[in-house]
UniProtKB/Swiss-Prot annotation:
Name of the molecule in the record: Myomesin-1
Subcellular location: Cytoplasm, Myofibril, Sarcomere, M line
GO CC annotations on file: cytoskeleton; M band; myosin filament; sarcomere
InterPro entries membership: FN3_dom, FN3_sf, Ig-like_dom, Ig-like_dom_sf, Ig-like_fold, Ig_I-set, Ig_sub, Ig_sub2
BP GO annotations: extraocular skeletal muscle development; muscle contraction; positive regulation of gene expression; positive regulation of protein secretion; protein kinase A signaling
Chain ranges of the Fibronectin type-III domain: 492-587, 620-714, 721-814, 918-1016, 1023-1122
Gene3D superfamilies, alphabetized: Immunoglobulins
CDD domains: FN3, Ig, IgI_titin_I1-like
Pfam families with a match to the protein in the record: fn3, I-set
Species the sequence originates in: Mus musculus
């Protein structure tokens, strides 16, 4: 015997098999199954021989008490149906009597229903479905043999119960027994005759055909002989069992007292929730069950709607609606019949929140949109929704305001009945915020952006719903970058979010901007701001290129906001939009703060305290790994140790270079509080290993295991460039661009598209928010203009290279008007699960009757037979009663709907609950000789309501020709599997499955492949089924399945899971587990994000691996936006809980918690609390029994689920955290520290997070408490939490350990500072120095000591800054202890005193000193300018001189070409080097270098073409070389060389021209009568010609004046006797071919004085004559 599959997992009417109380019953069943092997093969003979008797019995029984029989038969139907199919597999006799068997079975008379009554009663505690009996007047021959009567009972039976009094039931039982006793002998006779004379029977055509086949194969063989012997033995056993059966036909054996198969269980629920109590009772006659509350019978009519009592299929249910505090009571289920009474008890505890709920909301109800209510015209009111003045594709700029809106026209217009208006962006609902505000004015819907950001870019959809009708409209919004403050600076990043927040660090992520400002982005700066302040501080000193960065140095418990700025070579761009505030908290603490109370208010809380253990050094951390590595930082993650004591622990991180064993502590000053740490300042490309140590007050623990070798560098590669850019026309202003996505791209954020007018060379971004997918519509283009496009991908590592430019396309409208908004990338799914509205308005009226709901939607279902004459066909009736209550519909609406259907087809409407979609992937799970077990996958769409069942149809396929469809089940089956019986062996069948919910029956599935009905005898197991995917993330998912129905010859021992990419070939399957796993689930890790996968499961037993299951998938490995995970939290009372939140729940969604993927319903160790879209599962006493994976599934959603693993280490961590919360400590912002004040005072201080007014502090020094006095001053600021202690001076006896102990109510805390050894001496020295400094500053003193500075004129300026001076203060400068300057009348500004030294050189080396003095004291500052200090100064001077050098210039001379540069002045310390074409110049007579004044030159005499090239003058200041370059080639050389030739020729001419070398005086004074001899040397080549001039007239040689020229060099001028007539101006003119020169001289002849006197004394002759 084998329990049918549909009974093992049926939920619709057989929930009892899922109860733990039936495990014992099932084990008995397995034992009986083994013991009844012989009976299995022999029972069919008895069955075939007892058909006639059974028919007579059923006729009599039908006349006597048909109703009683139906109830009794319904209890044995389930097992009977299975037994009848099993009994027929063992012998030829069953085949010979198949016709009679089918005839009897069709009338509700199976062998197991009358045979071995004790088996059916103890093996099947479920209620049995009734079989229809033969009417008394019907003849055997008049009934068709192949017709199967539908098995169902009337609706009244299920609703009102079967009996009204115990007496009637006893009478019916007695009548039934009497009929059996009367027909017992006839049955035995009929069985004997049937076995001997079956060939002569003519009861049906099928029996005749069977006998004819037996006669055909009359020839016996060894097999036939053995089979006949087995039949004979089976017949003997049947006769014995018949005698046993007759012995049981008495009233005493049939009657038995009530027995609870399933007892009601106690429940603890929240107020306003519903609760159901279930129980199942067995007994004969059937017991009557009564429910009691606190021993008072429950009256359903006295409290209408409060209690619902149901009894269906033996399962009794009490439902209490909207529990309140008064429903807390003890409930009793009392079952009674004539044999006795039995009771079962269960308690219901209703709990309420204390101060959590607003009672007014509970009384008044929740405010809902008016459109959800019934309209004045009823549900059938039709609304036409139109959009006028619609918003178009919009363009905005960052910082601007924008408003989207349209006018909504709804007809008919109904007062006080407003539509529901919802806005969506990229498919997600838009919630009101400070950035965006929706508004509805009564006829116009608007969406206003107060400050546009690039995050606001996307496809916006407005959806208006009125009643059950809706309409929607979509358009895209583009946001351009704001104008940069610095021209050429990059645009602002976007989407700044926090990825991983912890106690002291937060990882920030952002998206790179599309515009880089014209130069590549060098990196990003991250700024933080504490919430409540306006101060922004920069988090990183150097720009980071990776779009993720861990921000450290945060204060635990405080909230921060972040922004990001991009930087390129031009400057820093505008900041991004600030992120949402995020708190620096431990994730568990954050989840605790967000969660609801761990338990409802019960009125009393008892707290017990335990002494914590001390002195436990923590163990090593575990699971240390590198979670993220870039060139800028490396993030480590680990798990806390299991051994940690009962106090908080902190961590020290150590690093080590690969190849060395020298471990260095990274965080030497401050230990880490959270189990994560970010390391900076690592050398890129270098390999490291890391480890972590734990520490507490007891000491530092052992190190963890080291990580694998980590090479510092970006692990995430920049994506490759996209390819195949294809533009296509759309509208007059837009173009659709498609591309081939980047290959092997990891963590892809999206794509940026750019457009350029052909020939312009200027690219403009088409989108400022990365889009996913491979298609985008670029708007805002110029009509009739030609454009080209390019695309690049972006991920956290950066932006890819640009793709190749697309082909040019002219912007014009495409034929057909372009593409609809549905083709936008990642936006093709209608927003928020909205129905596509391209077909106009949507809506659907509810079905008007139950028949329409269940049958009218299935066109493939055959119509029911209209009369008994149609029963000749072997068809199953289509009448179904799965839905007990018809769906109501207003009767007044029938006529209008009918009129509408006649006049015009009704518009498509959207019903809140639709029929489900079709199931798919039908497969055969197990096959027998005459039955098969099918499995299928649930529909993708449930229609908004839970699926209540499935209907299966099948048809034969003979010679590839399918037959007619037949129904396999009348009652809907709730499981996704069903066993179909009464099939033909070795026949092919096809199947269809339809799903049903409260809205009706959905469309049938596609026709399955052909399955052959045959006995499976293979040794390996069959395929697993119901493979389900859940918890899909970007790199992991969870796979679940059910074991195969057919386990093979040996039990299943494990499973293998395979996967492959969806697009891969079948030969690329790879296994995920090397060894078989026992669990029926597996978490698959290591998936590639964005890749589509399919999975399959194979079962294995001792014989081998079985057939694979149907494929699960394909599924894309991605983490959907908004995905939330299960988080663990520990509240202040130490209560540990798992929390989950889902913002995508529907009204019918429920949270289902599981442990190791087995539901945890009513677990005594757990308590589940659901409130709205949040759920919490609390551990009552976390222990080793609670280890496992806890998952939470949300029903009626798109597979939303999450899980959390609690292993031994996590359990220890949570228990330690719970202990810490039970015994809290005072949190500190800063530990005890010491600082030196201005006068040398010492301040000890620490800061607590928060102190109450009752906080007390004890000050401990060397384990002794100290108090306020002359030496110590204490102060506590309870508002800021600062605790201080002051000491005037540190003495030697103050060395030791200082401790501040805090007591604040229950919480305690302390902080210790150790000041001993070198640390104390250094602190003491610093205090004394500060004291002396304070004394010094009481008089005139130096605020800044003497220093030097080199000015732009290369002078040296000695300067210092003085303070506290007055007019009487003297300032004296000294050099080498000699006074050089006194400044008595100082009027300098800002207290700056200077001494200027011009043309500084070695002579200025020495010691400089400045002294300040007045009546208050004096101070001095000394500057050493010798040796290295002087050399450093000279280096700076030389550097300034070198920087003052002018550019090299070219000058031509008569000797050659000179290159020169001027400096402010020259020092010998400045080294000058010249090079020619990169080679140093060797100085010769032809090439020389030198310095003349401030000119540094290089002289090239007689230049040649080899002197062409690049000349470099390098001025070396002692540390750095400064170069000046000139190119002496080409035209520059030609011009310089030509000038040199000219100057050279001019020099030659100047040298060889005729000239007077000397000898001639300027003036010759001579006495008259004397001889004048002048000699003059002349020169010229060739020798010059000589001529003389007198008074500018030529003078010729004569006797008086002799002119001679000898040897071409000497000219002689002689006057023999000079007279006054010879006075005058003379000139010597020399001349040759190169030129001439004139030398002038003057000859003055004078008369002696004596002759003048004589002449004066003599009278004039003229006068004498005149006398």
């Amino acid at each position: 015997m084998s329990l049918p599959f549909y009974q093992r997992s049926h939920q619709h009417y057989d929930l009892s098999y899922r109860n733990k109380d039936l495990r014992t019953t099932m084990s008995h069943y397995q034992q009986e199954k083994k013991r009844s092997a012989v009976y299995t093969h022999g029972s069919t003979a008895y069955s075939s021989r007892s058909l006639a008797a059974r028919r007579q019995e059923s006729e009599a029984f039908s006349q006597a008490s048909a109703t009683s029989y139906q109830q009794q038969a319904s209890q044995t139907y389930s097992l009977g149906a299975s037994s009848s199919s099993r009994h027929s597999q063992g012998s030829e006799v069953s085949r010979k009597t198949a016709s009679a068997y089918d005839y009897g079975y069709s009338h509700g008379l199976t062998d197991s229903s009358l045979l071995l009554e004790d088996y059916s009663s103890k093996l099947s505690p479920q209620t049995k479905r009734a079989k229809r009996s033969l009417l008394s007047g019907e003849e055997t021959g008049s009934l068709p043999g192949n017709y199967l009567v539908p098995i169902y009972s009337g609706r009244q039976v299920h609703i009102s119960g079967i009996r009204d009094s115990e007496e009637e039931r006893i009478k019916e039982a007695a009548a039934y027994i009497a009929q059996k006793t009367l027909l017992a002998s006839e049955e035995a006779i009929a069985a004997s005759k049937q076995s001997t004379a079956s060939k002569q029977s003519a009861t049906s055509k099928r029996t005749t055909s069977t006998l004819q086949r037996e006669e055909t194969f009359e020839k016996k063989s060894r097999n036939i002989a053995i089979r006949e012997k087995a039949e004979e033995l089976s017949l003997k056993k049947t006769l014995e069992e018949t005698q046993t059966y007759h012995g049981k036909l008495n009233e005493d054996h049939l009657l038995h007292a009530p027995e609870f198969i399933i007892k009601p269980r106690s429940h603890t629920v929240w107020e306003k929730e519903n609760v159901k109590l279930h129980c199942s009772v067995a007994g004969w006659p059937e017991p009557r069950l009564t429910w009691y509350k606190n021993q008072v019978p429950i009256n359903v009519h006295a409290n209408p709607g409060k209690y619902i009592i149901e009894s269906r299929y033996g399962m009794h249910t009490l439902e209490i609606s909207k529990c309140d505090f008064e429903d807390t009571a003890q409930y009793r289920a009392s079952a009674m019949n004539v044999q006795g009474e039995l009771s079962a008890y269960a308690s219901v505890v209703v709990k309420r929140y204390k101060g959590e709920l607003d009672e007014s909301l509970l009384r008044g109800g929740v405010s809902m949109p008016l459109s959800f209510a019934v309209t004045p015209y009823g549900y059938a009111s039709k609304f036409e929704i139109h959009f006028d003045d619609k918003f178009d594709v919009s363009f905005g700029r960052e910082g601007e305001t924008m408003s989207l809106g349209c006018r909504v026209v709804i007809t008919p217009e109904i007062k006080h009945f407003q539509p529901e208006v919802q806005w969506y962006r990229n498919g997600a609902p838009v919630s009101p915020s400070k950035w965006v505000q929706p508004h509805w004015s009564g006829d116009r819907a608007t969406l206003t952006f107060s400050h546009l950001n690039k995050e606001d870019e996307g496809l916006y959809t407005i959806r208006v719903r009125m009643g059950e009708y809706y309409e929607q409209y979509s358009a895209y919004v583009f946001v351009r970058d704001a104008d940069a403050e610095i021209e050429g600076a990059p645009a602002a990043p976007l989407d700044v979010v926090s990825l991983d927040a912890n106690k002291d660090y937060i990882i920030i992520s952002w998206k790179q901007p599309a515009v880089d400002g014209g130069s590549p982005i060098l990196g990003y700066f991250i700024d933080k701001c504490e919430v409540g302040t306006d101060t922004w501080s920069q988090c990183n000193d150097t720009p980071v290129k990776f779009a993720r960065f861990p921000v450290t140095g945060l204060i635990e418990g405080r909230s921060y906001i972040f922004r990001v700025r991009a930087v390129n070579k031009t400057g820093i761009g505008l900041p991004s939009r600030v992120s949402e505030p995020v708190a620096a908290l431990d994730p568990a603490e954050k989840a605790r703060l967000k969660s609801h109370p761990s338990a409802p208010w019960t009125g009393q809380i008892i707290v017990t305290e335990e002494e914590p253990t001390e002195g436990v050094i923590p163990g090593p951390p575990t699971d240390l790994s590198v979670t993220e590595a870039t060139r800028s930082y490396v993030v480590l993650s680990w798990k806390p140790p299991g051994q940690r004591g009962h106090e908080g622990i902190m961590y020290f991180v150590e690093k080590c270079d690969v190849g060395a064993e020298n471990w260095q502590r990274v965080n030497t000053e401050l230990p880490v509080k959270s189990p994560r740490f970010a390391l900076f300042d690592l050398v890129e490309g270098k390999s490291y290993r890391f480890r972590v140590r734990c520490s507490n007050s007891a000491g530092v623990g052992e190190p963890s295991e080291t990580t694998e070798v980590t090479v510092v560098g970006d692990k995430l590669d920049i994506p490759k460039a996209p390819g195949k850019i294809i533009p296509s026309r759309n509208t007059d202003t837009s173009v659709v661009v498609s591309w081939e996505e980047s290959r092997d791209a990891k963590e892809l954020v999206g794509y940026y598209i750019e457009a350029s007018v052909v020939g312009s060379g200027k690219w403009e971004p088409c989108n400022n928010n990365p889009v996913k997918g491979s298609r985008f519509t670029c708007h805002g283009l110029t009509t009739a203009q030609s454009y080209i496009f390019r695309v690049r991908a972006v991920n956290a590592a950066g932006l890819s290279e640009y793709s190749q430019d697309s082909e040019a396309i002219e912007v014009k409208a495409a034929i057909g008007g372009g593409v609809s908004p549905d083709v936008w990338p990642q936006l093709s799914d209608t927003p928020g699960g909205l129905t596509d509205s391209r077909g106009g308005m949507n809506g659907a009226s509810p079905p008007t009757s139950q028949k329409d709901a269940l049958l009218g939607s299935n066109p493939n279902k055959p119509s029911p037979p209209s009369s008994p004459s149609s029963r000749g066909q072997k068809e199953v009736s289509t009448v179904s009663e799965s839905v007990q209550e018809p769906l109501s519909s207003p009767p007044q609406e029938a006529a209008p709907e009918e009129e509408q259907s006649q006049s015009e087809p009704p518009k498509k409407k959207k019903d809140p609950v639709a029929v489900p979609s079709a199931p798919y992937d039908i497969t055969c799970l197990e096959s027998f000789r005459d039955s098969m077990v099918l499995g299928w996958k649930q529909p993708d769409t449930t229609g908004g309501a839970e699926i209540t069942g499935y209907y299966v149809n099948y048809r034969e396929v003979v010679g590839e020709v399918p037959g007619k469809w037949r129904e396999a089940n009348i009652k809907a089956v709730s499981d996704a599997a069903y066993k179909i019986s009464n099939l033909k062996e070795n026949t092919l069948y096809q199947f269809q499955v339809s799903a049903m919910n409260i809205a009706g029956l959905g469309a049938p599935s596609t026709v399955s492949e052909c399955f052959k009905c045959e006995e499976w005898t293979i040794a390996v197991p069959g395929p697993p089924h119901s493979v389900k995917l859940s918890e899909v993330r970007k790199n992991s998912l969870v796979l679940q399945w059910k074991p195969p129905v057919y386990s093979g010859r040996t039990p299943v021992t494990g499973y293998f899971v395979d996967l492959k990419e969806a697009s891969a070939k079948d030969d690329q399957w790879r296994g995920l587990n090397e060894a078989a796993i026992v669990n029926k689930y597996l978490r698959v890790q290591g998936l590639k994000e964005g890749t589509s996968y399919v999975f399959r499961v194979r079962a294995v037993n001792q014989a081998g691996v079985g057939k694979p299951s149907d494929l699960a998938g394909p599924v894309v490995a991605e983490t959907r936006p908004g995905t939330k995970e299960v988080v663990v939290s520990v509240d202040d009372d130490g209560v540990i809980s798992l929390n989950f939140e889902c913002d995508q729940m529907t009204p019918k969604s429920e949270f289902v918690w599981s442990k190791d993927y087995v539901p945890t319903e009513d677990s005594p160790r757990l308590e589940v609390e659901n409130k709205g879209d949040k759920t919490k599962m609390t551990f009552k006493d976390l222990g080793t029994d609670d280890l496992g994976t806890y998952s939470c599934d949300v029903t009626d959603t798109d597979g939303i689920a999450s899980s959390y693993l609690i292993d031994e280490e996590e359990m220890k961590r949570l228990l330690a955290l719970s202990q810490e919360h039970k015994f809290p400590t005072v949190p500190t912002k800063s530990e005890l520290a010491v600082e030196i004040l201005e006068k040398g005072q010492v301040r000890f201080w620490m800061q607590a997070e928060k102190l109450s007014s009752n906080a007390k502090v004890s000050y401990i020094f060397n384990e002794k408490e100290i108090f306020e006095g002359p030496k110590y001053k204490m102060h506590i600021d309870r508002n800021t939490g600062i605790i201080e202690m002051f000491m005037e001076k540190l003495q030697d006896e103050d060395e030791g350990t200082y401790t501040f102990q805090i007591q604040d109510g229950k919480a305690t805390g302390h902080s210790t500072l150790v000041l001993i050894g070198d640390v104390y001496k250094k602190l003491q020295k610093e205090a004394e120095f500060q004291r002396q400094e304070w004394i010094r500053k009481q008089g005139p003193h130096f605020a800044e000591y003497l220093s030097w500075e080199v000015t732009g004129e290369c002078n040296v300026l000695l300067k210092c800054k003085v303070a506290n001076i007055k007019k009487e203060t003297h300032i004296v400068w000294y050099k080498d202890e000699r006074e050089i300057s006194v400044d008595e009348k100082h009027d300098f500004k800002d207290g700056i005193c200077t001494l200027l030294i011009t043309e500084f050189s070695k002579k200025d080396a020495g010691f400089y000193e400045v002294i300040l003095k007045d009546d208050r004291g004096k101070d001095k500052s000394r500057l050493k300018l010798v040796d290295e200090a002087f050399q450093d100064l000279m280096t700076e001077v030389c550097k300034k001189i070198a920087l003052s050098a002018t550019d090299l210039k070219i000058q031509s001379t008569a000797e050659g070409i000179r290159l020169y540069s001027f400096v402010c002045y020259y020092l010998d310390d400045l080294k000058v080097n010249w090079s020619h074409n990169g080679t140093g110049i060797k100085y010769t007579d032809r090439v020389k270098s030198g310095v003349t004044g401030e000119q540094i030159w290089l002289q090239i005499n007689e230049p040649t073409p080899n002197d062409k090239g690049k000349y470099v003058m390098e001025l070396f200041d002692g540390k750095t070389g400064h170069q000046k370059t000139v190119d002496l080639s080409g035209q520059a050389f030609d011009e310089a060389f030509a000038e040199f030739q000219r100057l050279k020729q001019a020099a030659i001419a100047e040298k060889n021209r005729a000239r007077v070398l000397g000898g001639l005086p300027d003036v010759v004074t001579i006495q008259e009568g004397k001889a004048l001899n002048l000699t003059c040397n002349v020169w010229g080549d060739p020798p010059p010609e000589v001529s003389w001039l007198k008074n500018e007239k030529p003078l010729t040689s004569d006797d008086h004046c002799s002119l001679k020229f000898e040897a071409g060099k000497t000219a002689f001028f002689t006057i023999s006797g000079v007279s006054t007539a010879d006075s005058g101006k003379y000139g010597l003119v020399v001349k040759n071919k190169y030129g001439s020169e004139t030398s002038d001289f003057t000859v003055s002849v004078f008369i002696p004085e004596e002759e003048l006197r004589k002449g004066a004394m003599e009278p004039p002759k003229g006068n004498q004559k005149s006398k």
